[in-house]
């Protein structure tokens, strides 16, 4: 399946075209679900903020003196009322804001994951193209909404990938639920998988193919 829907304008006029640039796609046998999983895991881990924090027994206020003498009380020996087993005591092995959740994935593995995700999107007929020339003199949410409604995409998660930083187009997509717009060099495997439909500008598609093929 190498034919895709091409948006000829922002009015929702489309035609079916044959993909000329196919070097980004791989055979079904080479699709690697494990690398797709790894790339999403890495992206989510790297976006995680280390904000959870607790106090250890050294940081909790109070408990400097020994609660009672060492011997001859019939009780277990204690050194501080701020030990972890006391109410109000410090936390043993608690979360720290210094913890680093960063993960890495080598570029070759990420390329395979990206190719696999794009191939899956093409196979499920979720890949569309958009002409390079976008005439938007001002932001217009209504224009994008009408376009999506005309092709029955209004209830689907749509990802627009554009070639140049067209502020009017990016702002037009912001207020529409389930619609995301990104520059070609910002799109990730997670973005592709998280969308039902990916609409990519022709030049953006060529640039993505150069980088990830």
Swiss-Prot record:
Record Pfam families: Ribosomal_L4 (PF00573)
Keywords on record: Ribonucleoprotein, Ribosomal protein, RNA-binding, rRNA-binding
Region Disordered, residue ranges: 51-90
InterPro entries given in the database record: Ribosomal_uL4, Ribosomal_uL4-like, Ribosomal_uL4_dom_sf
One GO term (biological process): translation
Ranges annotated as biased composition (Basic residues): 63-75
Domain of life of the organism encoding this protein: Bacteria
GO annotation, cellular component aspect: ribonucleoprotein complex; ribosome
GO-annotated molecular function: rRNA binding; structural constituent of ribosome
Family: Belongs to the universal ribosomal protein uL4 family.
Quaternary structure note: Part of the 50S ribosomal subunit.
Function (record text): One of the primary rRNA binding proteins, this protein initially binds near the 5'-end of the 23S rRNA. It is important during the early stages of 50S assembly. It makes multiple contacts with different domains of the 23S rRNA in the assembled 50S subunit and ribosome. Forms part of the polypeptide exit tunnel.
Name of the protein in its database record: Large ribosomal subunit protein uL4
Naturally occurring in which organism (per UniProt): Malacoplasma penetrans (strain HF-2)
């Amino acid at each position: 399946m190498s034919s895709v829907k091409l948006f000829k304008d922002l009015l929702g006029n489309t035609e079916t075209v044959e993909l000329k640039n196919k070097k980004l796609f791989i055979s079904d046998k080479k699709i690697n679900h494990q690398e797709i999983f790894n790339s999403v895991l890495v992206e989510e881990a790297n976006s995680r903020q280390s904000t959870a924090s607790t106090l250890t027994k050294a940081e909790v206020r109070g408990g400097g003196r020994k609660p009672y003498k060492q011997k001859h009380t019939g009780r277990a020996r204690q050194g501080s009322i701020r030990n972890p087993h006391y109410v109000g005591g410090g936390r043993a092995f608690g979360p720290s804001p210094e913890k680093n959740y960063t993960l890495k994935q080598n570029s070759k593995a990420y390329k395979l994951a990206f190719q696999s995700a794009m191939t899956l999107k093409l196979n499920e007929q979720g890949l569309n193209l958009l002409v390079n020339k976008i005439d938007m003199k001002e932001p217009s949410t209504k224009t994008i909404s009408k376009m999506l409604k005309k092709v029955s995409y209004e209830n689907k998660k749509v990802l627009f990938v554009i070639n140049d930083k067209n502020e009017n187009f990016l702002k037009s997509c912001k207020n529409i639920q389930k619609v995301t717009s990104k520059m070609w060099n910002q799109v990730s495997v997670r973005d592709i998988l998280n969308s039902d439909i990916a609409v990519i500008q022709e030049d953006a598609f060529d640039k993505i193919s150069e980088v990830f093929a």
